[in-house]
Amino acid sequence: PEDRVEEVENRLLERGWFRTQIDPYEDRYYRVWMHEIPPLRHQERGTEIDIHHRLLPRTSRLSSDPAPLFAAARPLGDPRLHVLAPADMVLHSLVHLFLEGDPDEGLRLRDLVDVHDLLCHFAQEPGFWAALVPRARELGFERPLCYGLHHAQDLFATPIPPAVLQALADAAPRWPIRQVMNYLIHHALLPGHPDHPYRWASLSRWLLYVRSHWLRMPPGLLTRHLAQKAWLRFRGYRKRIDLAQLDLKQQ
C-alpha cells in the first residue's frame, strides 16, 4: 500500500540498496504523480527493484485504485508475502503491455507471450474465465483486456471461451479506431532487427507511446511534463547515473 512505501524504501536502503541519482524534477515526478518511486539498485549485485503502489499513475484517465488489488491478493507460504489474484495478474500484464509510458518497455512480443502463458495456466483454475471480464469492468480495464485477448488469440491461438469474447464485445472501440489500433499493435509487436529495421514498426511503437502518455496525464500536465523533459535533454542531463560507477571512477 502507498502508505507503507516510505517504510519499505527505508528498509531496503538499510540492506544494501541505494537510490540511483536522477534529476530532481524526475524524482519529484515519480513521487508525486507516478505509480512507483524511482528504482533502487543493489550495491553488490547491481540488480534493480521497482516499488509499485498502484498499477497506473495517479493522473491516468483509467481507474487505478489499488485497494481492490490488495484486498484480493493471495498469501504465499510466508504469510507476510502475497501475490495478485489470477485475474488481477492478467490485467496487470495487459495494462503495462498496452499503456506503458517508457518507449524501451512498451509493446513487446515476449510480454504478449507472458499473457498467453498466464491465460493458459489460470484457465485450469475453476472460475477464472467467469471472473476475468467482471473484474476488468470493476477495475476499468476492459479495453486493455479486449486488445490483449484479441491479439493473443490472433497470434498464438490462445484458447479463449467464446462467451468471454462476447462479454467484451461492448468494450471494443468503434470500427475505425479498432482497425487502426489492431494495425499499430500488430506492427509494434514485430521483433526489431538492428540491420533491417522496419519503419512501420518504429512508427507504430512511437504512436502507441504517444497514446500511452495521452492516457496517463491530462493535457495541461502532459504539456508541462514534455516541455520539462525536452529542456532536460537540451541541457544534456543523463536520465540516470549509476552511483556505484561514479564511486569507481573516483577511486
Model-identified regions with their sequence ranges:
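Conserved NTP-donor binding/palm subdomain of two-metal-ion nucleotidyltransferases/polymerases, i.e.
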Residues: 2-251
